[in-house]
Amino acid sequence: MSIFTQEVSAINGQSGNIKQMLTLEMLPELKSLLSDSVEQQICIDGILTLWIDKTQLIPALRLLKTLPQPFDLLLDLFGVDERLRLDKDKLPAQDFTLVYQLCSINRNQDIRLKVALANDQAEIPSITAFWPSANWYEREAWDMFGIIFSDHPNLYRLLLPPTFKGHPLRKEFPCRATETEAFSLDDERLAIEQEALKFDPKRWGMEQSNKDNDYLFLNLGPNHPSVHGVFRIALQLDGEHIINSVPDIGYHHRGAEKIAERQTWHGFIPYTDRIDYLGGVMNNFPYILAIEQLANIQVSERVKCIRVMLAECFRILSHMLFFGTFAQDVGQLSPIFYLFIDREKLFGIIEAITGARMHPSWFRIGGLAQDLPKGWDTMMQEFVDEFPKKLDEYEVMVMQNSILKRRSIGIGQYNTQEALDWNITGAGLRATGLEWDLRKARPYSGYENYDFEVPTGHKGDAYDRCQLRVEEMRQSVKIIQQCINNMPEGEVKADHPLTTPPSQRSKHDIETLIQHFLNVSWGPVMPKGESCFAVEATKGVNAYTIISDGSNTSYRTRIRTPSFAHLQMIPKMAKGLMVADLIVILASIDFVMADVDR
C-alpha cells in the first residue's frame, strides 16, 4: 500500500465535521482484501480516501456493506474528468475518476473509494444490486461523462433530453452556450423531440396487459400541480391501482456543476441559492464551509452564530411551505394561507438583515456580506415569541384532521434499512426512528453549543414525515432564541488573504484596496486540493465536494442534494397504492425540482 498527500495544507487544515477520522487499520477486513494494490490519498476533509482497481470495486463494496458496523449509506457517486488536471503526477494514471462515498451511521464515519478509468475503457460494473439508489447516480455519470455501467438495468439519459448529443461534464464540452451552435426548434425538430419523449413501456420492462386486463399508462406531469415542479411520472395502472411507475426528471436541469467550472469561487455563491430555491442561505452553507476547510480559513464565533440563526430561519420558511402544501394536496386549503402570512413576516426580517428575501446570497468565504443591522434582535424576538403559538394552532388544524390522518397514516411507509438502501436522509430517515441529524452527529458552525432535540418518528409513513417537520420548526425556534440571547461580539469577515476585506479598510491603505480589487475582479486563487462538507439542510443532507487545481475557479464542483436521491424511491413507495395515495406520497417527500435537477 502506498500513501500520498495530494493536499499539502491538509496537515494544518481542519478535519471537516466528521468526529473521528477513519484509518485503513480500523478496517482490517478491507485492508486484507485490498492487500498492497491500494493507494491512500490524504485529503483535507479527513475522509479515508482509497484508490482501488475496478476489479476490486464489487468485492470491496460488498465487504463494506456487510461489516458488523456497515457502511450502509451510499452518500454519493459521481465522476471527475481528470484529463486537464495540472497535478496529475500525484494521482494514479487515469482519464476519469469514479468516486464512491459511503457513510456508516453506527461508526459516524465516511469512506471514499476512487476508481481510475481510461478514456477508451470507461466501463465499470453497476452496483445497483447493493444499493438501489445507485441507479440514478450511475445514469447521471453516464449522462454527464459517458461512463458505461455494465449490468445496469436501464442506462438511459436522466437529466438531459434523449436526443442530446455529448456528455457535458467532459472538459472538451463548452461551458457557454455562445460556444455552441445556436438552438432552434423548427417543426421537424419539434416532432423529433416530442417523439423521443413518448413513454415506451417495453424499455422499462412493463407489460401492456395481464391475462385479465389491459393496463393503462398515464403521464402525471410534467405540469401537474401535485408534482411540485416540472416533473413527470409515467404510471402503469390497473384501474386506479399503481402497478409500476417511472419518474422522469431533468426538465429543470441548468448545468449548475458545469457553471461552477467557469465562475470564480466567490462568483458561484449566488448560483448555490438557486439549487434548493426554498433553502436560501442553507445552500450557501456547505459550499462556503467546503472552501473554508480547503483554504484553512477560520471565522469568528459571531459569524458562526449568525450563520446558524439565518440557516434555521430558512429551515422554518421551507418547512412552513411544506406544511401548507402537504395539507393543500390532501384537500385542506385554509392552512397554506395562514402559513403564507407568517412566511411573509419572517421574509421581512430576512430582507431587513440581508437585503433580499428568498435568495440573499449573504454568506461569504470567510464570513458574511455585512453585520447585523440595528434592531435585528427586536424583530427576531417578536417572531420567536409569536410563531410557536400559531404553530400550535396550525398543528391542531392539520395533524388532528380526520381526513388527513386517514389519507396519510400508513401511506408511503418504509423502514430504516430501506431508507438507507435508497439514500434517504433528513426527516425522511428520522421518520423511521433513526436519530441521524448532522447538526448533532457531526456539529458544524458551533451547533454543538446549542440545546435542541432531534425529533424522530416510528412508522416511517407520510404522516410521520409531516409531524417531524412540525417538531423541527419548534426546535429551530429554540435555536434562534439561543442565538438572540448569546450573540457574540466580533468581526464578520476573517482576516485572511483569500477573503474579501471589509470595505472601510480598503479606503485607508492601498494594499487592502489592491487585495480587494484582485479578489473581486479575478477571484481568489484557492490552494490545490479536495474538500467535501455536508450539512443538515432543510430536506436532508446537502454536500459540496470541490476540487481545486490552484486556480481562481473550481476544477470540479459536485453538488449532492437530498431531493435527487429521495425521488428515486417513488416507485417502491407507490406500488400497489392508488393514484390519490401517490399525491400524498409526493407531498410528504418535500422536494423542489431545482434541487433534483441542479
Swiss-Prot record:
Primary residence: membrane
Subunit (UniProt): NDH-1 is composed of 13 different subunits. Subunits NuoB, CD, E, F, and G constitute the peripheral sector of the complex.
The name this protein goes by in its record: NADH-quinone oxidoreductase subunit C/D
Membrane topology: Peripheral membrane protein
Xref: Pfam families: Complex1_30kDa (PF00329), Complex1_49kDa (PF00346)
One Gene Ontology MF term: NAD binding
Localisation per UniProt entry: Cell inner membrane
Organism the protein comes from: Shewanella woodyi (strain ATCC 51908 / MS32)
UniProt-listed Enzyme Commission number(s): 7.1.1.-
Enzyme class label: translocase
Keywords: Cell inner membrane, Cell membrane, Membrane, Multifunctional enzyme, NAD, Quinone, Translocase, Transport, Ubiquinone
Catalytic activity of the protein: a quinone + NADH + 5 H(+)(in) = a quinol + NAD(+) + 4 H(+)(out)
InterPro entries the UniProt entry points to: NADH_DH_suC (IPR010218), NADH_DH_suCD (IPR023062), NADH_Q_OxRdtase_suD (IPR001135), NADH_quin_OxRdtase_su_C/D-like (IPR037232), NADH_UbQ_OxRdtase_30kDa_su (IPR001268), NADH_UbQ_OxRdtase_49kDa_CS (IPR014029), NDH1_su_D/H (IPR022885), NiFe-Hase_large (IPR029014)
Annotated segments matching region NADH dehydrogenase I subunit D: 214-598
NCBIfam families per UniProt: NuoC_fam (TIGR01961), NuoD (TIGR01962), PRK06075.1 (NF004739), PRK11742.1 (NF008728)
The encoding gene: nuoC
Gene3D superfamilies: Cytochrome-c3 Hydrogenase, chain B, NADH:ubiquinone oxidoreductase, 30kDa subunit
The family this protein is said to belong to: In the N-terminal section; belongs to the complex I 30 kDa subunit family.
GO terms under cellular component: NADH dehydrogenase complex; plasma membrane
